[in-house]
């Protein structure tokens, strides 16, 4: 958490486990219509009870015959789109995630890779974070396709980020979270 940024402190993540946040012991973001086969029929009780630490995640991959995975953030992907958090605090939160996920992947880097989060409020900070993520061994940077401060990802504002991605060889992974709201859509 960035010193002096109470708005970020208020949004500090914390774990909540319980029936209200699970569906038959699957993460809550799986819709009720998700078939059991999505997990290959694997019993993921151990992973749930372990809080999905890296070792239990690898065991779940083994149970489902998954060789390797690229990890994306969940709730963290929304950080760069909080308009009331300073750009520095957004970058600090993205850096914290990158540090954590790099350590998580270090459990078995032959099987686990990850993308960092681009703090898109400030393209220079995003470029700095891309270089840092590359140094940590991450394979890309995530950006949501939503408009931010009236800009889409094709805006020249983001050139410093794109230059850093080209320099480091990282990919830009564009991934929406819960659906684009309030922005332009195809055909509009």
List where the protein language model places each region.
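Helix-coil boundary/capping segments in enzymes
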Residues: 1-188
């Amino acid at each position: 958490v960035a010193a002096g940024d109470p708005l970020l402190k208020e949004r500090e993540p914390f774990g909540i486990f319980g029936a209200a946040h699970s569906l038959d012991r699957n993460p809550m973001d799986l819709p009720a219509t998700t078939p059991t086969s999505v997990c290959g029929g694997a019993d993921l009780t151990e992973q749930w009870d372990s809080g999905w630490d890296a070792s239990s995640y690898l065991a779940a991959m083994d149970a489902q015959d998954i060789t390797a995975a690229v990890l994306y953030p969940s709730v963290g992907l929304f950080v760069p789109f909080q308009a009331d958090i300073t750009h520095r605090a957004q970058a600090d939160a993205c850096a914290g995630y990158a540090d954590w996920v790099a350590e998580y992947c270090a459990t078995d880097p032959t099987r686990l890779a990850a993308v960092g989060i681009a703090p898109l409020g400030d393209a220079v900070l995003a470029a700095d974070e891309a270089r840092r993520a590359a140094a940590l061994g991450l394979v890309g940077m995530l950006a949501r396709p939503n408009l931010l401060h009236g800009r889409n990802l094709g805006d020249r504002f983001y050139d410093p980020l794109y230059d850093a991605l080209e320099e480091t060889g990282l990919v830009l992974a564009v991934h929406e979270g819960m659906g684009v709201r309030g922005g332009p859509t195809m055909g509009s």
